[in-house]
Amino acid sequence: MERHFEKDLDELKERLLWMGSLAERAVHQAIHAVLDGDERLARAVLDEESAINDLQVEIDDRVMHLLALYQLMAVDLRFVLAVSRINNDLERIGDQAVNIAQSAQRIVRHPRVKPYVDLPRMSELAEEMMRDALNAVVRKDVELAKDVLVRDDQVDSLRDQIFRELLSYMMENSAVVFPAFELILVAKNLERIGDHATNIAEDVIYMVAGNDVRHSAPDRR
């Protein structure tokens, strides 16, 4: 029985990390669809959405199987519960990537509003947070998870800067209202990706240390 349990646990972790890699790729492709005006990348994100959704259902089923079949000790129970929450955040990251890809398809039809400066910085930071949060899951690294948490405010600051600048452009030139608004939506979706990466980092802390830190910061779920 113990051998079967370890196998089931390893497979659950493997599927979660595969889902994480798909979500990372979707975010990377979506933001580069915007920055490079690449509709092909945007379509690739939309085409792969179902794979992430299917994995969410599969992982949920595996979690329920483990909870129903085994009497889990505290550390294993925390791991399984954390996986369930991380699973949901990864699916939502996939949704944010789809939103960005759809914005990219609309933005490409218009002249560029301005040179991209803060948006690449914001996307790079959000991607780093996501990558480090998933690495923290693999390594069970509480310190790396805490490092992700402190970067959330940086993403929020970049979002605010982008909002202010684009709103100024919109007020000065009505011709850029539509693409500028889409870029605001892209920034908002990147901010949400940072929030979900932060949620994953919080779940790592819970999984490893047993400390639930979700309510020590504003709710992002």
Question: Model regions: which residues?
Answer:
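Cytosolic, long alpha-helical scaffolding segments
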Residues: 1-221
